[in-house]
Every structure is written in C-alpha cells, then in structure tokens.
Amino acid sequence: MIGRLRGVLVEKQAPEILLEVAGLGYEVQMPLTSFYELPDLNQEAQIYTHFVVREDAQLLYGFITKQERALFRLLIKTNGVGPKLGLTILSGMTAGEFVACVERDDIATLVKLPGVGKKTAERLLVEMRDKLKSLLETSAGSEREFMLKSNYTPAPVVNTAEEDAIAALLSLGYKPAQASKAVSAAFKEGMSSEDLIKSSLKSML
C-alpha cells in the first residue's frame, strides 16, 4: 500500500495533482482543503495517501495531514459514502468543522454539501459519533488540536418547505449557494414545498 509520497509537484488542477517521485508521476486526487495548502508548482511536496484498487482503476487520494486522511478513512466506512463523496465532504469543510457538525447533530449544515442528502447526513451523524470519539481519544495532543480546529458556524434554521426546495434544486444539479439564494428570494410565509420549488425554479430560468 502507498501511504506517503514526497516529490516534485509538476501539475496542479483541482482536485487533482501530478507528483513526480523518483522519475514516476503519480496522479493524486485531493480534497480542496488539502489542495489549497500545497506549495507552488515545481516545489517539493509531501502528502499522505490512501490507495484504492477497483476492477477498472487504481486510485490515489492525497492529504496534507495524517489526521485528515484518518477522517477520510472513517468517512468511507459509512454506509453510502464512497471515496468520491468522502472527498466532496472534506472539500466543503475542514476536519474540525466536520467534527463540530457531528458533535452538534447539525444535519442542516451537512445537507448543504453536494451529494449529501438528509438520509446520508443522518447516517453520518449516527455512525461517525463513536468513531470520532475513539479517534480523538487515541490522537496525540497536536493531532487532537488539529481535528478540533474549526471556524464552524451552525447553518441557520429553515422551515421544512425551504429544506425540501433546496434539496430539490440540489438534486437537479444546482450548486448549494445557488439553491439557497433562489429559495430565500422566492420564499413567502405559508408557501408549500411544491409552490416554493416552482417559484425558485422560475427565478433560475
């Protein structure tokens, strides 16, 4: 298993990099939280990796810290969360922000991430709670500090109609920011989910 790579960063195009190590080029996919911590092109970089072997491909996922990799490995053990969604989650929030979401049972923030529906968010909260507790208990002081570091702000409380409308727009491929903006602009007190979805869609056409 490939657990760590150190080499020259020869290509950077989010979320993928090409790292040259001893004459070999390794294609590595990274969460944006790690990607933006990388040095400039042609500089030396060290990353911690997770190696996935599938029938049709061999994939490397890279992280700046061992702690972020450890969290990724816990995420992909959650039912319904594969490497792609795990990468998306860690691109949308830091490790510390994710830990804070789980500690506060914050479904509203999790469902704003692309690909994370209400059921997946609920599974994450249930399945990750004990796993994170165990990870934090076994982490050294600096590692624990990293995992808890965040600029976490709970998502504002919204009513069911707004949640349903945002979820519907996300399922159609709109970005979280676009969906939230359109729903907020279209919302009127007493609107049903169906009417709010229709009004939000009209404003985006």
UniProtKB/Swiss-Prot annotation:
**Region Domain III, annotated ranges:** 157-205
Coiled coil regions in record:
none
Q: Name one GO cellular component term.
A: Holliday junction helicase complex
Report the SUPFAM superfamilies cross-referenced here.
Answer: DNA helicase RuvA subunit, C-terminal domain (SSF46929), Nucleic acid-binding proteins (SSF50249), RuvA domain 2-like (SSF47781)
UniProt record similarity statement? Belongs to the RuvA family.
Listed HAMAP family: DNA_HJ_migration_RuvA
Name of the protein: Holliday junction branch migration complex subunit RuvA
Organism of origin is Shewanella woodyi (strain ATCC 51908 / MS32)
